[in-house]
Amino acid sequence: MARPRLLVVSMSLPVTAKRTGEESWSFTMSPGGLVSALLGLKEFETKWIGWPGVDVHDAIGKKTLSITLAEKGCIPVFLEEVCDQYYNGYCNNILWPIFHYLGTPPEYRNDATITYQSQYEAYKKANQIFFDVVKEHYEEGDVVWCHDYHVMLLPQYLKEYNSKMKVGWFLHTPFPSSEMYKTLPSRSDLLRSVLTADLVGFHTYDFARHFLNACMCILGVEATSEGIVDQGKVTRVAVFPIGIEPERFINTSELSEVVQYMKKFKNDFGGRKLILGVDRLDTIKGIPQKYQAFEKFLEENAEWRGKVMLLQIAVPTRNGIGEYQKIKDQCHYHVGRINGRFGSISSVPIIHLDCSIDFNQLCALYAITDVLLVTSLRDGMNLVSSEFIACQKAEKGVLILSEFAGAGQSLGAGAILVNPWNIKEVSSAIGEALNMSHEEKERKHKINFQYVKTHSTQQWADDFMKLTLTNILCSKLIEITTSAELGAGLAATLELPEHDVIQQYSKSNNRLLILGFYGTLTQPMKNQERRGDGMNLELHPQLKERLKELCSDPKTTVVVLSRSEKCILDKNFGEYNMWLAAENGMFLRHTSGEWVTRIPEHMNLEWIDGVKHVFKYFTERTPGSYLETSEASLVWNYENADAEFGRAQARDMLQHLWAGPISNASVDVVRGGQSVEVHAVGVTKGSAMERILGEIVHNKSMATPIDYVLCIGCFLGKDEDVYTFFEPELTKKAKSLSSSGSDSPKKVSSTIVDLKGENYFSVAIGQTHTKARYFLDSSDDVVKLIGKLCTHNNA
C-alpha cells in the first residue's frame, strides 16, 4: 500500500546547495531544529519544498539543480527577485524580533512606512512563489505542512486555490503576547491567513495561549478549548512539543570513533569539569549573560578556579549582518576579559568557538559534559537540551535550562530552571549543578531521559498528522456558531447549488423567500468593519433595484425576518412590496398595512427594566459597547470594545443578571460571540415562523400552495430553528397557523405548504457548521443570487 504523501514547506531545504560547475552541484546538510526533527519522519512519502540556500539566475542551473534535488526528495523554491527584502528584511528584521520580544530595530521605526511596505510586499510575493511551487506538485489527497513565520500567508493562498486541501501550520519560534504582536502592521492579515489552516500547532501552551489571545483581541473572534471559531469555521489550535530522534544520538554516542573522541577530549581538558554551551550565535541565546553568570560563579567560588571550564560552541547564522557582528564582538569581549582575569599560562576558563562541529564530535562532547548551560532569553524549543540528555549514558550530567526556552515546560522536572536575566541565580545554579550528588543527578536524568525517549520526532510528527487528518476526515471539530453551541451531530453544510436554486425557482408557482437583514442584505460584515449602532444598518446598495424587481412578481412572497426594531425595517424596506417581521417576528406587517403585534398572550415582560438597568451600567463602564433595545428583548454588544475586557465584563454582567433581575424571570439568555442577549422564552425566528406564515395566509388569497422556499440568513444559534421549520418531512402534517384578528388560531391544511425536498433551500451566510443545508460566503453572494432570480420573474 502506498504511503500517504506529505509536502513539507519551509524556508530552507534540509540540504544547502553549492554550485561546482555549470550543470553540477554539491550538497551539505543544513543545520536547524526542523531538519533534525523531520529526519525521523518515515510513515509518509515526504517531499520537502524550500529555498536551496543559493541564488540561481540561469535556466540551466535551475533545471539541473531541480533534477538533482528531486533524487533527494526535495523541490527548490527560487527566490532571487525577493530574497533580500523577504528573508533578510521582513522575516528577520520585522517578524523575528517581534516574535522574540525584541521589537523592530530602531532604524525601521524611523523609516517605518517605506521600509515596512516594501518588505511586506516582498513577503507576499515570496509566499506566492511558495504557493506556485506547491500547486505545481500537489496531488489530490496530499497533506501540506507549512512551517514557521516565513510562510504565514501560504495557508490562505492554498485554501483559496482548493478549500479541500489538507493544510497544517506549525510555528517553531515563540509566539509573543498580544500586546507585542499588536505592534505588527500586518497583524490581521497574518492571523487570518493562519486561521484558514485546518490545524495550527505550537511547542508550548504559553505560545498557543498568546496566539489565541491575539486572535481574540485583534480579530474579535472567539476561542474555545478546541481552537478559534470564526464565522462558523473552527481552526484547531494545539500544542506539540517537538522532540529529536533519540536513537540516532544514543547509537552515535556508542560508536568507537565517538568513544575515542570522548577519551581525547577528557585528556585535553585535563580533568576539569566541563560546562557546555551549544547555541546559534544569536541575540536571543543569551551567550553574554551566560558568560557574566560564569564570571560571577568564579568570583564567588575561588575553590573552583582552574577546576572547571566553559566550552561555548557558537554556530554562525547570519554573517555580514550588523546586529550579529555586534553580538559576536560582545561575546569575544567577555571571553577575553574573563580569561584575562581568571586564566593562566596553562589553561583558560572559557573556550569560545565561532563554528559548528562534526556530529560525532558533538555527541562525544554531550556524553562527557558535566553541566549543559542553556540561557536563552527567548527560544522556541531548544532541541540541544534533548540531544544532551540522549547522549548522557555514563556521566549523568546536569541540565541548567532557561525558563524562557520552550523545553522548560517539557524538561523542567529534571533540570534546574533559571531566569537568564538574573546573573546571580544562574551563578548559584552552576554551583548547585557542580556540587549535586550522584543520586540526585541519576534521579533528574532518569526523568528527562524517559521523556526524551518517548517524545521523539516520530511521535511529534505522528501526533500532528493524525490530528490534522482527524480534523478533516472525521469532522471531529467542535461545531459552534458565533452565538452558542448548536450541539453535536450537525450534517456537513454544502455550498449552495446556485443552478438548482434558479431552476426550481423558475418552475415553481408560489414562492416564499425568507431573508435575514444583518449580514444578509447589508454589506458584508467583517470583523474590522463592525457596526457601532443598530440604527446604522443599511440595505446593500446593489440590492435596492433588484429587491424591488423581486418583490414585484405576484408568484413571490418576500419576508424580511430580523431581530431589528420596527423603525429600522421601515427605514430600509418601507418602499418594497414585502412582509416585515421585526424583533424576531414579535411585530409583523405588510408594507401596505400597519404593524401587528404578535406577542404571545400571557408573556411577562416585567424583567425588562431591571435588565436594562444592568446593561446600561456595563455599557457606561465598557468603552465601545452599546445597548440594543426592543419590546421583547435586550442585547448588550461589545464587538467594538477590547475583546478581552469585553469578555470579562460579560462574565460579571451575567452574575449580576442571575443574582437579580432574571433570577425568577421566564427568559432565555444567549451568550453570543461578542454579545449578551436576554429575551422572553420562545422568542426565536423559528418559533415565530408559524405566526408569520399564518398572517401571510390570512391576508393573501393563495390559489396554489407554497411549493418553493428559500431561507437565507446570518442568524444566531438560537434562531437557526428557522432553517428546520420548513424541512419537507415536517410539512406533511397539518400545521396550526395563527391568523390575525380576534379569531382563534386556525388549522391550516398541509395544502398551504406543499414542499418537496428539491424545492427547499436553507442557506447560512459565512457559516459552514450550521443547521442550514447550504452556505454562501457573504452578502455579496446574496446580491448576485437575487439578481439572477430576478431574470426568472413571472416565469
Swiss-Prot record:
Residues 4-469 are annotated as: Glycosyltransferase. One of its GO terms (biological process) is trehalose biosynthetic process. Pfam families: Glyco_transf_20, Trehalose_PPase. InterPro entries: Glyco_trans_20, HAD-like_sf, HAD_sf, Trehalose_PPase. Gene3D superfamilies: Glycogen Phosphorylase B (3.40.50.2000), HAD superfamily/HAD-like (3.40.50.1000), Trehalose-6-phosphate phosphatase related protein, domain 2 (3.30.70.1020). It catalyses: D-glucose 6-phosphate + UDP-alpha-D-glucose = alpha,alpha-trehalose 6-phosphate + UDP + H(+). Its EC number is 2.4.1.15. In the N-terminal section; belongs to the glycosyltransferase 20 family. NCBIfam families: PRK14501.1 (NF011071). This is Probable alpha,alpha-trehalose-phosphate synthase [UDP-forming] 4. It comes from Arabidopsis thaliana (Mouse-ear cress). The gene is TPS4.
